[in-house]
């Protein structure tokens, strides 16, 4: 699996240390093991997880601005866990409302010795925003409209929303409230992944 991960990273133009690669593989192995009992993801094959979960998450890393992020609706830690491994200088709050997912995240934190994550069981609307975050990240969590509506209190004055999407979400962009603007949309290159992937970056308009 290490060889496959190395080839995928090379294709994506991402350089990681051996320690980071081993952490990513350890996470995939834990996800595969716990998935049998906890049903954390529909992806069953660890090699497929490398593409659809690991690479699909970490290709976003170069676009994240700041050091304090919250991954809303993180599920089994996607994209937050892979991002925390490739961005060890940043801190990631991993938010999910389901206890079994948060228990898994805490076990990952313990076994991988990840000191830059904080798994939290909470609904996003009820989660406090102090201090505010540099970035609010979501992967398959909600529509853009729901994301900014439910998470409006989380980013700081210069903070951004980072939404990982499949095809270009033109309809969702058109429905954004006028107090928000799309700063940019990046077409992502995810090696060996069928279908398009986009990162939508949103900021609140200055009043």
From Swiss-Prot:
The keyword Methyltransferase applies. It is found in: Cytoplasm. Belongs to the methyltransferase superfamily. RNA methyltransferase RsmG family. Transmembrane segments: none annotated. Its EC number is 2.1.1.170. PANTHER family: S-ADENOSYL-L-METHIONINE-DEPENDENT METHYLTRANSFERASES SUPERFAMILY PROTEIN (PTHR31760:SF0). Keywords: Cytoplasm, Methyltransferase, rRNA processing, S-adenosyl-L-methionine, Transferase. This is Ribosomal RNA small subunit methyltransferase G. SUPFAM superfamilies: S-adenosyl-L-methionine-dependent methyltransferases. It comes from the Bacteria. The keyword Cytoplasm applies. GO terms for molecular function: rRNA (guanine-N7-)-methyltransferase activity. Specifically methylates the N7 position of guanine in position 527 of 16S rRNA. It catalyses: guanosine(527) in 16S rRNA + S-adenosyl-L-methionine = N(7)-methylguanosine(527) in 16S rRNA + S-adenosyl-L-homocysteine. One of its GO terms (cellular component) is cytosol. It holds the Pfam family GidB. S-adenosyl-L-methionine binds at residues 73, 78, 124-125, 139. Gene3D superfamilies: Vaccinia Virus protein VP39.
């Amino acid at each position: 699996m290490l060889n496959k991960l190395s080839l995928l990273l090379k294709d994506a133009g991402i350089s990681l240390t051996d320690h980071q690669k081993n952490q990513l593989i350890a996470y995939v192995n834990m996800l595969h093991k716990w998935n049998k009992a906890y049903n954390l993801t529909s992806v069953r094959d660890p090699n497929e997880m490398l593409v659809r979960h690991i690479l699909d998450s970490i290709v976003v890393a170069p676009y994240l601005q700041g050091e304090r992020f919250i991954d809303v609706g993180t599920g089994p830690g996607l994209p937050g866990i892979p991002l925390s491994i490739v961005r060890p200088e940043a801190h990631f709050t991993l938010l999910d409302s389901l206890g079994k997912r948060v228990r898994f995240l805490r076990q990952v934190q313990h076994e991988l010795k990840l000191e830059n994550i904080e798994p939290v069981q909470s609904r996003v609307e009820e989660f406090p925003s102090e201090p505010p975050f540099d970035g609010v990240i979501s992967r398959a969590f909600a529509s853009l409209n729901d994301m900014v509506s439910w998470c409006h209190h989380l980013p700081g004055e210069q903070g951004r929303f980072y939404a990982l999407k499949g095809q270009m979400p033109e309809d969702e962009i058109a429905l954004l409230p006028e107090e928000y603007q799309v700063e940019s949309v990046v077409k992502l290159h995810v090696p060996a992944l069928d279908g398009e992937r986009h990162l939508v970056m949103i900021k609140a308009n200055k009043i």
